[in-house]
């Protein structure tokens, strides 16, 4: 996002369709596939072999930020950690080999502590969650890390395409935008494993934020009356309780 682009075609030259198909079939447990809901046991991660980066996240408890409605309240609330925090301390490893396939047992290119939470608005209700990830050091201080060839930063988004069954819509939109303007987030496809369970194909995304390789504006200077800024339009209203169709089931017509 901003400056030199690192947009890449993620099907590497040494790979072929013939090589990929048998490996994919070997990792899939066909009897565990469901038409109406996700089953993490449908993929045997020990047999997973992919040209996409593999993101492994380990947590000590459920990731906070899942929405729920409480009796007597007309607006939604969000789950917190067992200590009442909105973010959970966790670890993340990224396996991203340059000249061979990626498997869960390969040496990680990135190994870091993180803070993580569920992100989104209505998308928080989807079966496939998206996550806000902050890379930190051992004492919890934000630590910039370069991930999948993108500019070093500490705030990232793991976007889980859900309604878009092609998984490509946001990925393509960001890449097209990046060819037309400077300030479009870089993106990378990846496969996510959470606590040993396969979660599917995700998109690792830069956030729109101030910094080198992001939006190149200076921090506010209290001695000057001119400054750069980013405007964020967010939803600050409390939504009433209502049923949400998350489109997980299909009907033949």
Question: What do these predicted ranges mean?
Answer:
Residues 1-253:
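Phosphate/dinucleotide-binding and metal-coordinating scaffold of catalytic cores
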């Amino acid at each position: 996002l901003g400056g030199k682009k690192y947009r890449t075609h993620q099907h590497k030259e040494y790979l072929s369709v013939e090589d990929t198909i048998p490996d994919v079939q070997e990792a899939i447990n066909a009897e565990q596939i469901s038409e109406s809901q996700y089953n993490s046991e449908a993929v045997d991660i020990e047999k997973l072999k992919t040209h996409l980066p593999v993101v492994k996240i380990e947590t000590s408890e459920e990731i906070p930020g899942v929405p729920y409605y409480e009796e007597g309240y007309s607006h939604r609330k969000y789950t917190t950690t067992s200590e009442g925090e909105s973010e959970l301390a966790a670890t993340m490893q990224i396996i991203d080999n340059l000249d061979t396939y990626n498997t869960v047992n390969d040496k990680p290119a990135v190994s870091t502590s993180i803070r993580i939470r569920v992100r989104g608005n209505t998308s928080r209700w989807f079966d496939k969650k998206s996550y806000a990830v902050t890379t930190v050091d051992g004492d919890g201080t934000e630590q910039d890390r370069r991930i999948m060839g993108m500019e070093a930063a500490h705030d990232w988004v793991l976007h889980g395409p859900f309604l878009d069954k092609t998984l490509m819509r946001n990925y393509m939109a960001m890449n097209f935008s990046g060819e037309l303007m400077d300030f479009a987030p870089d993106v990378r496809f990846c496969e996510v494993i959470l606590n040993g369970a396969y979660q599917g194909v995700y998109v690792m995304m830069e956030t729109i934020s101030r910094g080198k390789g992001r939006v190149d504006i200076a921090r506010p200077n209290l001695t000057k009356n001119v400054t750069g800024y980013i405007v964020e339009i967010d939803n600050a209203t409390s939504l009433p309780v209502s049923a949400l169709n998350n489109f997980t089931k299909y009907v033949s017509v």
